[in-house]
């Protein structure tokens, strides 16, 4: 096949490059809250409950951004929505340098709004740019999100100090400004808008009038809460260990968690060749539970890194596999009507991260708060067994 070197094709390739770079930066911004939480807590003299409200602030902003994505894309196109999202993240991340708790909370709301607007916009624009290879294109795109998440902790450790995040947030602001501006210019040439008003003519299968859909949504509520709680609190949890093993300080539990999270995404297609969605989910949940148990009982950074690696690998395939189950159950067009599913995930993330901080403050021990993660895993295993048994009953009848 002769390579396509037309100006339009070259423009699309450059835009794709910028979108992947933007998604990498967005991955860093998404998990930034967990990495700066110990610094903000020390600077503002916060207990875990007060710090936990920052999670609610960010996820509230993210929920607003997700809700407003469709009308903003309709009005300004994907490029305009992404630029607005990057601008919000820029303003929010700089606001984290304030010495006022309320200003920092507002900054997390603004940052969350940018994240909630940017991630779906980049995903949808990637679909528009790759109509023939949607699945591999999205998998490759989300790999870059994972890379950004992996390097967030080392980035903050290298450029920040125990009491200041001015330098790393300033660097992120510059990257957001340059990348957002470049995406705006690159996407201006061909304004791509999603035809959200287009409804399938073939009477789509009902979704949210069924109990199965809401059970899958509850599954998403708890699981996204687990992922957010782990990613958000594991850095603080590791820093409070009485036995700090300096020999493994570089391979921190946070770094290990996100590293094996990305590796798990790569390994998932191999397992999918031999296992269906239900068995994949159960295997992932059992692996995750093992990792969480090691996390809770570990007393050195090395043991925590091991538990975080196992938990990250186990949980990595659960969200996409649950989405695949949702689509397989309700049809290929179900993703266009999956808004309640994503809302449940955002609400679960806000509740779980806050609950961990609340329990930690009341028992004066973050380990008690982290038990919420184990409870989440056990609940998900029970729910998955129920959904699996229910699906077998439905098929047999």
Protein language model features and the residues they cover:
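Extracytoplasmic
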Residues: 15, 21-40, 46, 230-235
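Extracytoplasmic gate region of multi-pass secondary transporters
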Residues: 33-34, 211-262
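Interfacial helix-cap and linker-helix signal at transmembrane-aqueous boundaries
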Residues: 40-41, 72-73, 155-163, 238-239, ...
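Short hydrophobic/small-residue motifs within alpha-helical transmembrane segments
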Residues: 58-60, 146-147, 257-262, 346-348
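Conserved MFS/SLC helix-loop-helix module at the cytosolic interface between two early adjacent transmembrane helices
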Residues: 64-102
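Helix-loop-helix hairpin linking two adjacent transmembrane segments in secondary transporters
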Residues: 101, 132-133, 140-188
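Cytoplasmic helix-loop-helix junction between adjacent transmembrane helices
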Residues: 108-143
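C-terminal transmembrane helical hairpin of 12-TM major facilitator-type secondary transporters
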Residues: 278-322
């Amino acid at each position: 096949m002769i390579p396509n070197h037309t100006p339009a094709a070259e423009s699309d390739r450059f835009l794709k490059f910028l979108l992947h770079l933007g998604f990498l930066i967005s991955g860093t911004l998404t998990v930034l809250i967990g990495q700066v939480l110990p610094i903000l807590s020390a600077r503002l003299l916060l207990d875990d409950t007060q710090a936990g409200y920052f999670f609610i602030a960010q996820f509230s902003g993210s929920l607003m951004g997700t809700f407003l994505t469709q009308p903003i894309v309709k009005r300004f196109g994907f490029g305009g929505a992404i630029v607005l999202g990057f601008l919000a993240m820029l303003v929010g991340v700089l606001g984290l340098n304030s010495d006022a708790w309320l200003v920092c909370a507002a900054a997390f709301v603004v940052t969350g709004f940018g994240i909630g607007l940017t991630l779906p916009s980049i995903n949808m624009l990637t679909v528009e740019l790759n109509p023939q290879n949607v699945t591999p294109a999205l998998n490759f795109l989300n790999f870059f999100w994972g890379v950004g998440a992996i390097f967030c902790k080392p980035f903050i450790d290298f450029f920040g100090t125990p009491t200041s995040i001015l330098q790393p947030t300033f660097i992120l602001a510059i990257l957001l400004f340059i990348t957002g501006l470049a995406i705006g210019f690159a996407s201006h040439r061909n304004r791509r808008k999603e035809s959200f008003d287009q409804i399938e003519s073939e009477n789509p299968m009902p979704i949210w009038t069924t109990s199965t859909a809401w059970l899958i949504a509850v599954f998403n509520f708890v699981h996204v809460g687990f992922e957010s709680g782990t990613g958000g609190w594991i850095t603080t949890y590791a820093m409070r260990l009485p036995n700090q093993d300096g020999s493994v300080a570089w391979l921190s539990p946070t770094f290990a968690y996100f590293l094996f999270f990305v590796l798990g995404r790569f390994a998932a297609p191999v397992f999918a060749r031999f296992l269906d969605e239900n068995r994949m989910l159960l295997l992932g949940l059992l692996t995750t539970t093992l990792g969480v148990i090691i996390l809770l009982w570990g007393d050195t950074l090395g043991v925590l890194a091991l538990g975080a690696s196992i938990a990250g690998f186990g949980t990595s395939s659960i969200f996409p596999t649950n989405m695949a189950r949702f689509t397989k159950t309700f049809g290929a067009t179900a993703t266009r009507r999956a808004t309640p599913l994503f809302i449940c995930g955002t609400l679960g993330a806000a509740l779980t991260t806050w609950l961990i901080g609340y329990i930690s403050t009341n028992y004066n021990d973050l380990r008690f708060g982290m038990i919420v993660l184990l409870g989440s895993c056990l609940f998900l295993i029970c729910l998955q067994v129920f959904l699996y048994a229910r699906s077998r009953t439905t098929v047999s009848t």
